[in-house]
Curated annotation (Swiss-Prot):
The gene is prcB2. It catalyses: Cleavage of peptide bonds with very broad specificity. This is Proteasome subunit beta 2. CDD domains: proteasome_protease_HslV (cd01906). Component of the proteasome core, a large protease complex with broad specificity involved in protein degradation. It comes from Salinispora tropica (strain ATCC BAA-916 / DSM 44818 / JCM 13857 / NBRC 105044 / CNB-440). The active site is at T54.
Amino acid sequence: MAAAFDPSGRFPDLFTSVGTSSFSAFLSKAAPELLPGRRPLPPGMATGLTPHATTIVAIATAGGVVLAGDRRATMGNLIAQRDVEKVHPADAYSLVGMAGAAGIGIELTRLFQVELEHYEKTEGAMLSLDGKANRLAAMVRGNLGAAMQGLAVVPLFAGFDLAATDPAKAGRIFSFDVTGGPYEETGYDAVGSGSVFAKSALKKRFRLGLSVDDAVRLAVEALYDAADDDTATGGPDLTRRIYPVVMSATAEGTHRLTEAETAAIAESVVAGRMENPGG
């Protein structure tokens, strides 16, 4: 239950007392019902009743990391949305993408962004990249009850590590399971229903020391391959001009490719596959 406010208009002690730098920990005391996974759910499975986001890929580069996601959300055998955005900046130097229950994933992403901003404002410094991954892991763990009823959210987190001694290894990738376990991945990773096909494509084409531009094209190709075999993953939609969301994190910060830039890459990939469908 949310903290009761004083009729005089003063904030409750909870809002003014010295506490944790974690916004989600504060929210768990002030209004726990607002946290994902804390709401009571009826018995049964809800897998086919809500839109689900699908495939996200991450690739480490010589100067950072690239994160990309397709735009399709499905509900059972239906396409629920064709232009959903699953990849977002977590803060100035990190990115997060969500696969799974779309509504919970969007809520979890926003909460994670606030969590990192709240920490930076209260502590006067940014969390380390490992610290960010651990905070996200705790949030995913908090959704375990809903995950057991078919409303799982599986994030993919990537960022530029400002504390890295070797700039060539500053791009780091973390995957998670539904219980909140964080796992650092080497080189590349993918999550979602098309991840098996995306990772197969990445496995064949990935090499150490990729430039950001090469990694961006590789990410789009991996999503194309995933869409080719997985009905829940959307490929480049040339008719509606809907293309993957592609972002990078480097020493200069996070950057999202413009619609025109992504369109040019996607159309080039599609043209190449018309000549060689297998890539």
